C-alpha cells in the first residue's frame, strides 16, 4: 500500500509497504538527484560551440556541418539566431551550397530543433544514471522521477537557447512529413508511450520526443511497483510535463525570478511534491 499525504506545513509523508518515508528521507532521495547534477557534463551528443567562420566539414557531410553550426547559433541566441546564410558563413561555404541541402531557413531550424530535443533527452538520461540507485525499489522509482524533473529544469536554465529552440514552432519539411505518415501507418494498433488507453491525439504524438518517452518510462515504473494505479496512468505525462515546463518558462521568460539555484531547486521540489502527491496513493 502506498499512502501520500501532507503533514504539517506542505511536507510530504509516504508509506510504502508499511515503511514510512519521512520528509527527511524524501528530501534525501531528491537531494541525491540534485547532487548528481553538480559538476555534471553535457550529454554525449552535445554539440561543441564553434567560433564564427571557423567551422569546417568533411567532404560529403555539409548537411551535418550546417546543422552543427545551426546548433551553435541556437545555443547562443535561440531559434531566431538560426539563419541559413550565417550557418553557411560559419562553415565556410556559399549560401548556394547550403541551399542544396536545406530549402530554406525553416528546414535548417527544424533540423536544429531535433538536435536540441536530443540534447535535452541526453541530459535527462545522464541525470537518471548519475546518482547512486536506491536499494528500495519504491525509493528508486521516486528518485528517477525527480531526477527527470530536475534535469529538465536545469537544462532549461543552463541552455536557454537550445531549450527555446527545442520547443519552437517550425514547419516540418515535406520529406520528414512523408516519413512521419509512413511511421504512423506502421504503428497502428501498437502500444504507445502515453498509455495505450490515451484518447488525446496530441498526447499520443508526444511519444516522438525522447524526453517524453523518458518521463513515460518513469511513470510506467510507478505502475509496475504498484505506486500508481493503472487506471490513472493514461495521459499522466501531460500534467507532470506541463508543471515542470511551465516552471522553466516562468524562470526563463516570465516574472518568476528566484535569484539562485537553491531557490530554483526549492521551487522545483515543491512542484515535484505536488506531482507525486497527485499521482500516487
Predicted regions and their residues:
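Amphipathic alpha-helical packing segments from all-alpha helical-bundle domains
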Residues: 139, 175-227, 234-239, 262, ...
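C-terminal peripheral helix-coil segments that are non-catalytic and often amphipathic
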Residues: 1-50, 209-213, 217-225, 249, ...
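Basic, helix-initiating cap at the start of DNA-binding domains
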Residues: 2-5, 11-77, 84-86, 90, ...
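Amphipathic alpha-helical segments used for helix-helix packing
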Residues: 157-198, 249-257
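Hydrophobic alpha-helical connector segments
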Residues: 125-162, 186-194, 203, 208-209, ...
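Key DNA-contact positions within bacterial/archaeal DNA-binding proteins
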Residues: 94-96
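An amphipathic alpha-helix adjacent to DNA-recognition modules
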Residues: 60-71, 75, 80-81, 92, ...
Amino acid at each position: 500500500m502506498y499512502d501520500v499525504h501532507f503533514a504539517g506545513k506542505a511536507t510530504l509523508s509516504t508509506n510504502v509497504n508499511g515503511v514510512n518515508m519521512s520528509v527527511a528521507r524524501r528530501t534525501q532521495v531528491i537531494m541525491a538527484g540534485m547532487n548528481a547534477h553538480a559538476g555534471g557534463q553535457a550529454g554525449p551528443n552535445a554539440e561543441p560551440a564553434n567560433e564564427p567562420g571557423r567551422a569546417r566539414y568533411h567532404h560529403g557531410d555539409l548537411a551535418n556541418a550546417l546543422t552543427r553550426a545551426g546548433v551553435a547559433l541556437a545555443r547562443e541566441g535561440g531559434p531566431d539566431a538560426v539563419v541559413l546564410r550565417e550557418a553557411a558563413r560559419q562553415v565556410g561555404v556559399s549560401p548556394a551550397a547550403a541551399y542544396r541541402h536545406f530549402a530554406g531557413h525553416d528546414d535548417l531550424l527544424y533540423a536544429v530543433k531535433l538536435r536540441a530535443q536530443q540534447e535535452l533527452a541526453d541530459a535527462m538520461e545522464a541525470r537518471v544514471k548519475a546518482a547512486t540507485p536506491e536499494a528500495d525499489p519504491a525509493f528508486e522509482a521516486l528518485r528517477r522521477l525527480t531526477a527527470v524533473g530536475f534535469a529538465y529544469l536545469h537544462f532549461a536554465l543552463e541552455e536557454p537557447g537550445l531549450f527555446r529552440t527545442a520547443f519552437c514552432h517550425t514547419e516540418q519539411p515535406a520529406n520528414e512529413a512523408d516519413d512521419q505518415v509512413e511511421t504512423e501507418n506502421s504503428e497502428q494498433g501498437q502500444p504507445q508511450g502515453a498509455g495505450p488507453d490515451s484518447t488525446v491525439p496530441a498526447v499520443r504524438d508526444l511519444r516522438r520526443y525522447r524526453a517524453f518517452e523518458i518521463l513515460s518510462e518513469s511513470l510506467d515504473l510507478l505502475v509496475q511497483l504498484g505506486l500508481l494505479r493503472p487506471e490513472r496512468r493514461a495521459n499522466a505525462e501531460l500534467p507532470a510535463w506541463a508543471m515542470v515546463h511551465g516552471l522553466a518558462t516562468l524562470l526563463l521568460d516570465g516574472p518568476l525570478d528566484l535569484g539562485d539555484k537553491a531557490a530554483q531547486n526549492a521551487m522545483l521540489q515543491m512542484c515535484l511534491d505536488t506531482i507525486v502527491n497527485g499521482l500516487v496513493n
